Regions:
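Topology signature of small-to-medium multi-pass alpha-helical membrane proteins
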Residues: 1-142, 148-153
Length: 153
């Protein structure tokens, strides 16, 4: 029987959907103009699409990548926007659109996946002591490990 994803997971999925849609628009624009590098956006679409499917299925590895990759990419995006604005290489409107369309949704994904109901959905709450855990017992995160009681499930 499949579990229904809680609200924070749906928020993360919706935020990833915004990022995927914006990436698709940018990829189509660059492909249409004949610019090189449009395939990078296509790769990002595929990567985020796989991540989105994993989040909906309750895969722990997707939770791990979604939580931390989204945070790192959001920080990199904000730093890039700040650098572009400080060197006057970006207009404020473009930076605001990039922040609202990419960085903010990425931060929303990371925050939403850190909620207690998201931990429970991805079976990241220790059955022995009830402590939430974000540590995997193996490389692919098929089993989780509790920091507090060292239980593996």
């Amino acid at each position: 029987m499949r579990r229904r994803p809680p609200t924070p997971v749906w928020i993360a999925v919706a935020a990833l959907g915004v990022v995927i849609a914006l990436q698709a628009v940018v990829a189509l624009y660059f492909a249409r103009v004949g610019s090189l590098g449009w395939w990078r956006f296509g790769f990002a679409i595929v990567l985020f699409g796989v991540l989105l499917a994993g989040l909906l299925r309750g895969v722990r590895l997707a939770w791990l990548w979604g939580r931390y990759l989204a945070l790192v990419l959001g920080v990199v995006m904000v730093a890039s926007l700040a650098a572009g604005l400080s060197r006057h290489e970006l207009r404020w409107e473009v930076a605001a659109l990039a922040f609202a369309g990419v960085a903010a949704p990425l931060f929303a994904v990371s925050i939403a996946l850190g909620r207690p109901t998201a931990f429970a959905f991805f079976d990241l709450v220790c059955p022995n002591c009830g402590h939430p855990s974000s540590f995997g017992a193996d490389f692919l995160f098929r089993k989780a490990r509790c920091r507090r009681c060292r239980n593996t499930w």
